[in-house]
Amino acid sequence: MATNILEQLTEQRIASVGYLSLPFKNYFTYQSTHTSTSRFNVNSASWDRLWVVYRPTAYGTQKEPVAVSGHKNGSGNVTYDVGGSYTFNTNNERYISNYFKFVDPGDTNTKYNLQVNSANVPAYKMSSAEALSMTKGAVDMPKNVMSLDQYRNDFFVQCYRFCLPDSDFNRLASGLDTRSVSAQGTLETTSVNACALTLFAECSSELRVGSGRAIEVVQ
């Protein structure tokens, strides 16, 4: 039987608080050709994460699909262990496009450092192995398992978390509030080749719906 309970609850919420809050994710993108230092700024009520994507400068060139490291090559042989690795499920063919091939622009001695308003995040310069560990911890439910070699050659994406764990599930704005003082970010690397850098600032925004269909967006 149809009721108007939901409408009553909505009206009571608007009457008590003044508006109905509808949180949603918002993303801001920054692109540059990176050699050693790239700068950006973020102004948001809740800056949750920073996603860093490294690609070769010729990533837009059309070419054949690229085999993922460790999986079967053109001759049908796996490139890690005989029979494939059960942990990484490499006993099959797997391909990605050149556009979505994210490659570590450095070597094993390369260090990565993020500064937000002159504060280091984390407090030391990371290697690519440490970046993989940090990225897995920055996502509440990591699903993909990969080797360090696959990470550096095919899926090199770094994620810096600024929000509390499980805040996405509860839709809580627990990230950095950078509205009064805009966050000035600097990404520094050592011993890297020139690459195409794309930054995604993941933020929690809020749509406020008031009486009389009045709306407001809090970035």
Regions found by a protein language model. Name each.
Residues 1-219:
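Flexible assembly/topogenesis modules
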